[in-house]
Amino acid sequence: TSDYKPLYDFSVNYGFFPIVDYILEHDENLLQSVADVINKVNIDKYRTESFLPTIQQHNAYECVLNDENSDISFVAPTSFGKSELIVRHIKKVNNLTLKAAIIVPTKSLLMQTYKYVKAQLADKKILLHDQMYTGEESYIAILTQERALRLLEKRNTNFDYLYIDEAHNLFEKDMRNRLLARLIRLSRVKNQKCEILYFSPLVETSDNLKVLGTSTISEYRIENNIKIPTYYLYQNKKASIYNRYFNKLYELPGQYPTPYRYILSNATDKNLLYITAPKKMEVVTIKFAQQLPDLVSPAIDKIISSIKRHVHNEFQMVSLIKKGVVYLHGKLPDYVKDYIEYKAATTLEIKY
């Protein structure tokens, strides 16, 4: 109906400020009354640069930033401002000797986190590898648990603040997460005053995160998620949509002879396809790209030319880029991965 007034009123009352902001940007008619103008002014008070939190996010952030406990847990849905909170916390505790470490579970998350932190804290020395440490008095380390553990074990340094991303991994019993538990213990051994902040979307009870040296954990939880995903299932050439309220699948009209045809029929301007293993991913990507025509585009030609020049002529992804398809996995060199990721985000012709 294009009538956003009910959604606008609901969002104002429940503090869903990003929704209010979006509606006001696209419907100036809602700024006709004095009350609506006042709402706009009040909401803008919560904005920091380009980031606008919900009221629940804002309140949780303030609680975390003012909490003096040495162990804090922030439980919130994925993509709900965790990186923003980490940056705000670092800015608050920042000093000339600050040593902080952000621990990410995989190498693939290193550069993503680095770009965000570097943009917000450009004046700080940032380490991405334990070998980058050269005796600095102050730094922000963005590391995997393996690299952080090597840094503490082999170098004369310690952390004042430790930010654990995907903290629920502590519950797993594999080697990587045993290393994470060792890292937390060693951080406290080397600096008893080390403050640890745990971030996760999945922790049921934060007391389960207790490791050596932890008495109580302050927990802050985001209960209301304004972003609800829609789930579709493709099976036996048919597609269904999942209703989370009735826990039931409803079959949709139409038939699709292959999964590739289903994807192509429902594609948007940008589409992220997740495959579980690098070897399998490359095979699936090649088969998928075979469904697409070659693109005639100066932008695509320029990307291909650059890859041939800086990687090699027979690089497998060249034939895929011609069709607007790229892939990313942890075994790609970082400089290639960063370039491909940037071009995929900024080139309209690359849809998959």
What do these predicted ranges mean?
Residues 1-352:
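N-terminal helicase ATP-binding lobe
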